[in-house]
């Protein structure tokens, strides 16, 4: 499902978790108060995990939802501060399109203060980072194509 190329930097995996609500779509957003941010759920692989396993596990830990992976959406890249003399390191986050199949927000871990559904029309003004907005838009366009039966 994901490119087989090796990435020399840090790697994480996460999810664009969606649900249909009437005629609109909603996406899970995780919020932190200090420092303030609204993000998609994601995290670092445990030893021996493939990225799909990491994405599912991290989404369940951070949101409380059990999910099913439907497709690979894409990745984003950015630099993270590593501290010390090395400065910044590149990081790549792989995202998967997911739907909830169980669980509940009340079961989320303490990494985020709030986990909530956000309407698709509000996602651009809600998420902190534009690259995550782009991933959500790509994922939701995949959902819309699926519902119309087009590849």
Give each language-model segment a name:
Residues 20-26, 84-88:
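Short, solvent-exposed loop/turn segments that connect beta-strands within catalytic domains
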Residues 34-36, 107:
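A conserved beta-turn-beta hairpin within the catalytic core of GNAT-like acetyltransferases
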């Amino acid at each position: 499902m994901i490119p087989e190329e090796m990435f020399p930097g840090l790697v994480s995996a996460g999810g664009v978790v969606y649900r249909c609500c009437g005629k609109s779509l909603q996406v899970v957003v995780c919020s932190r108060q200090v420092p303030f941010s609204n993000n998609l759920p994601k995290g670092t692989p445990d030893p021996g995990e493939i990225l799909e396993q990491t994405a599912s596990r991290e989404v369940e830990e951070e949101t409380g939802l059990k999910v099913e992976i439907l497709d690979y959406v894409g990745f984003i890249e950015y630099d993270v501060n590593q501290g010390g003399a090395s400065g910044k390191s590149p990081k790549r986050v792989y995202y998967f399109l997911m739907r909830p199949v169980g669980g509940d927000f009340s079961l989320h871990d303490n990494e985020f203060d709030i986990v909530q559904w956000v309407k698709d029309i509000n996602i651009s003004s809600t998420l902190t980072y534009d690259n995550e907005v782009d991933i959500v838009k790509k994922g939701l366009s995949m959902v819309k194509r699926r519902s119309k039966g087009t590849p």
